[in-house]
Amino acid sequence: MPLLDSFKVDHTKMKAPGVRLAKVMQTPKGDNISVFDLRFCRPNHEIMSEKGTHTLEHLFAGFMREHLNSKDVEIIDISPMGCRTGFYMSLIGRPSETEVIKAFENSMKDVLKVTSQDDIPELNKFQCGSYKMHSLSEAKEIAQNVLNKGICIIKNDEIKLENF
């Protein structure tokens, strides 16, 4: 089985919170598709709570689109990592890491402004596969942690595993 790109980086050297341009590919028509690693926690040191991650999944995707989508950038998907240390974001276009950091920070500020569990989008049994597995307070705690620590740029050449 081929080794996925996400496993070709040394997770022991990865800083967090951080933004890493994980991959850029081009479609046959010439559009750039960029994949970003949006790291919330240091791998193997911290982990986001299950309910907080799920609530962030519902909130973060919309907030990031509000702050990052433009005539040159369109987010395709934002999904949590199985290790619960971050999210992957796939998009059409090639925003800078600085632009992504600004959108990430503003999205975390937006999470802190959500006042009620009732304000979480798609939080119902028809649109969510685990609609009872949410915690706005845990999502806010994660967001505040990101803002308190600050978001850095994670450079691939600094965390590349040798021999891969």
From Swiss-Prot:
Function: Involved in the synthesis of autoinducer 2 (AI-2) which is secreted by bacteria and is used to communicate both the cell density and the metabolic potential of the environment. The regulation of gene expression in response to changes in cell density is called quorum sensing. Catalyzes the transformation of S-ribosylhomocysteine (RHC) to homocysteine (HC) and 4,5-dihydroxy-2,3-pentadione (DPD).
Record has Zinc as a keyword: no
Protein name: S-ribosylhomocysteine lyase
BP GO terms, sorted: quorum sensing
UniProt EC number: 4.4.1.21
Naturally occurring in which organism (per UniProt): Campylobacter hominis (strain ATCC BAA-381 / DSM 21671 / CCUG 45161 / LMG 19568 / NCTC 13146 / CH001A)
Homology family: Belongs to the LuxS family.
Pfam families: LuxS (PF02664)
Subunit structure: Homodimer.
Cofactor note: Binds 1 Fe cation per subunit.
Keyword Metal-binding: yes
SUPFAM superfamilies from the UniProt entry: LuxS/MPP-like metallohydrolase
Higher taxonomy: Bacteria, Pseudomonadati, Campylobacterota, Epsilonproteobacteria, Campylobacterales
InterPro entries: LuxS_sf, Metalloenz_LuxS/M16, S-ribosylhomocysteinase
Keywords, sorted A to Z: Autoinducer synthesis, Iron, Lyase, Metal-binding, Quorum sensing
Residue ranges crossing the lipid bilayer per the database entry: none
Binding residue positions for Fe cation: H54, H58, C128
Root EC class: lyase
Domain of life: Bacteria
GO function terms (MF aspect): iron ion binding; S-ribosylhomocysteine lyase activity
UniProt cross-references to NCBIfam families, sorted A to Z: PRK02260.1-2
